[in-house]
Amino acid sequence: MEEAKKDDSLSNVAEYSVSEISHALKRTIEDTFGHVRVRGEISGFRGAHSSGHCYFSLKDERARMEAVIWKTTFARLRFPPQEGLEVIATGRLTTFPGSSKYQIVIESLEPAGAGALMALLEERKRKLAAEGLFAESRKRPLPFMPHVIGVVTSPTGAVIRDIIHRITDRFPVHVVVWPVRVQGETTGAEVAAAISGFNALQPGGTIPRPDILIVARGGGSLEDLWGFNDEAVVRAAAASAIPLISAVGHETDWTLIDLAADRRAPTPTGAAEVAVPVKAELEANIARLSARLKGAISRCLDRRRQETRSLARALPSPDQLFALPRRRFDEAAGRLGRALQTSTQGKRLHLNAVRVSIATLDRRIAQARRDANQCGERLPLVYQGLVRHRRARFDRDAARVSPRVTLQRITTLGERLKIAIARKDRAVSLRVERARTVYEQAVRLAESLSYKSVLERGFALVRDGEDRPLKRASDVKPGETLRLQFADGNIGAISTGKSSNTNRKSAPAREPGKQGSLF
């Protein structure tokens, strides 16, 4: 009885074809789950198919799920899938009726956790470093004084206000901001496009081309700063023809753009300090250097002026220089007058000698006519010779005045001038030295001949009342007033008329047997 009831219930179950049940399952799964986020490890990824689509699996310890990324979605992914990478896939669940399998159609893909991000970051860092994008040889020096600064950042955050405020305080320059999103899936593409856009600007255009670029963002987590690790951003920074400063995050935050940039700043404010110097310090340095330059020029001019005065004192006076030429000119003028008189007399005698008759004049005229005819016949030949001579002389002059020859002559004359100046300096120095030696010898001779040196040895100079020196005792009269000049002063005296010489007392006789003095 029970078996009969069971058979009746089974006969009431709806009957489906394979296609019907497959499509019913497909609708049920798609309607029930819709969009889901699935965490798993990528397995079986071999790159994009020839059609541009990607097929692989997501797995964990107990299950596996097929996954597909369509061509249009794959081109928009922030990073490509990699074998063995743990990811979080967002997409729609669906089934494929032809094989009775369910799969996830992935619309976005992101690494699962900081560990996966760090692994992906290290892999991307090794790849780009192997291409030489982080090499120090690629980095360019920053301009000392940029006129225009391009900033790639969010136009509404505190970062751009801090940068502009710091630049205004240090050295106000023109700032051009390229607005981008600094967080999200489109960050990498927008930042790369901004760097390339600044480099595409032409000098002198409507928008000025920056002299330096600053890519800036405030601090954040690894996920927040992930857009600045994008491969497109790193390649754009490395290819930038404009020097680039990276100021992403705080001092402890590092991104791949920091390695590709020409300079890394710890903060956006630090990037502004690196980009421009302090105007007040520059003005102070310029003032100090200007004062030093003026002092050096003044000292140099004073030294040259003193040297010129010394040389001028050593040179002879104009009267001494022109004395001999003036005398020669006077002598030549006298000889010229006498020569003119002699020549006039000779011409007058010659004129008297040639006063002849009419016949003599006719003969001389005929002779002059014949000479003129001969000269007329020789004139074309002489003219041609003169033309050839002038042409040859012109060619020689043209060769001499060529730029190369002129430069050689200028160089030669410059060398001769240097040699002449050196010879002049040596001659002046030698003449000054000789004059100094003669002067010193004259001083020593005058000192040796002065009577004062004799007074120093204990002698005295006797003068009479009229201050005339007395040479003999006979010149002194009794009672005459005298003046005696010693080395240290003068005293007065009166002559007594008697000789002051007295006989010396003889030495007493010595007793016999005692030895006396030798003197």
Swiss-Prot record:
Pfam families per the record?
Exonuc_VII_L, tRNA_anti_2
Subcellular location(s): the record lists: Cytoplasm
GO cellular component terms listed in the entry, alphabetical order: cytoplasm; exodeoxyribonuclease VII complex
Q: What is its EC number?
A: 3.1.11.6
Biased composition annotated in UniProt, kind: Polar residues: 496-505
UniProt xrefs under InterPro entries: Exonuc_VII_L (IPR003753), Exonuc_VII_lsu_C (IPR020579), OB-fold_nuc-bd_dom (IPR025824)
Provide the catalytic activity annotation. Answer: Exonucleolytic cleavage in either 5'- to 3'- or 3'- to 5'-direction to yield nucleoside 5'-phosphates
The record's subunit annotation is:
Heterooligomer composed of large and small subunits.
Which family does the entry's similarity section mention?
Belongs to the XseA family.
Q: HAMAP family recorded for this chain? A: Exonuc_7_L
Which named protein is this?
Exodeoxyribonuclease 7 large subunit
Q: Which organism is it from?
A: Chelativorans sp. (strain BNC1)
